[in-house]
């Protein structure tokens, strides 16, 4: 079943769950599938002198389980699912100024609004870490687009597999 944005938003606000244990946010938040992200993000922060991070799409924070990360971290989501997550619409207004915006498994849900969202990100951060797919990745859903962000951002400066092979990659771009 393919839901419209409005229908999906309504389901989420009513407490829709992904049906997975430990998280309401889907497979991309499971500890097994976030292992590489939890490993490389602190390394990238050290390598590029990143001291502050906005997590744009933090969800229920399940993905960070057990992660040691010595940075100034602020979590945002359109529908906060954890007390430390603040409500924010990344498609409508720039995030507070930070070194890095982390937007893992989020842009893929807002495909028509990706260009305007990336323009807002460029106003807010020096770097972006986001989910990346190759240009030949097959589309499987109208709720999750396998986006090749190189179309808007060029080649990333870092790339790592993000979860199982079909989950795509976590890539890092310099925004300005």
What is the role of each PLM region?
Residues 160-176:
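Core SAM-dependent methyltransferase catalytic element
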Residues 139-163:
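Conserved Class I S-adenosyl-L-methionine
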Residues 109-124:
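A short, conserved alpha-helix within the catalytic core of class I
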Residues 51, 99, 126:
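Conserved acidic residues
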Residues 99-112:
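A short SAM/SAH-binding and catalytic strip from SAM-dependent methyltransferases
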Residues 1-91:
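Conserved N-terminal segment of class I S-adenosyl-L-methionine
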Residues 125-136:
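Conserved beta-strand signature within the Rossmann-like core of class I S-adenosyl-L-methionine
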Residues 92-97:
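Short conserved loop adjoining the S-adenosyl-L-methionine
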């Amino acid at each position: 079943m393919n839901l419209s944005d409005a229908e999906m938003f309504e389901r989420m606000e009513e407490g829709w769950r992904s049906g997975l244990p430990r998280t309401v946010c889907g497979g991309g938040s499971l500890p097994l599938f976030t292992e590489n992200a939890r490993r490389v993000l602190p390394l990238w922060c050290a390598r590029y002198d990143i001291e502050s991070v906005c997590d744009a799409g933090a969800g229920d924070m399940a993905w960070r389980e057990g992660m040691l990360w010595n940075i100034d971290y602020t979590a945002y989501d359109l529908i906060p699912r954890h007390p430390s997550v603040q409500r924010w619409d990344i498609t409508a207004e720039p995030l507070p100024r930070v070194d890095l915006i982390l937007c893992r498994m989020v842009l893929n849900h807002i495909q028509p609004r990706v260009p305007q969202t990336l323009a807002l990100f460029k106003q807010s951060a020096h770097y972006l870490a986001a989910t990346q797919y190759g240009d030949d990745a097959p589309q499987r859903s109208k709720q999750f687009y396998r986006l090749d962000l190189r179309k808007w951002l060029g080649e990333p400066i870092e790339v790592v597999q993000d979860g199982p092979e079909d989950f795509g990659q976590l890539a890092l771009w310099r925004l300005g």
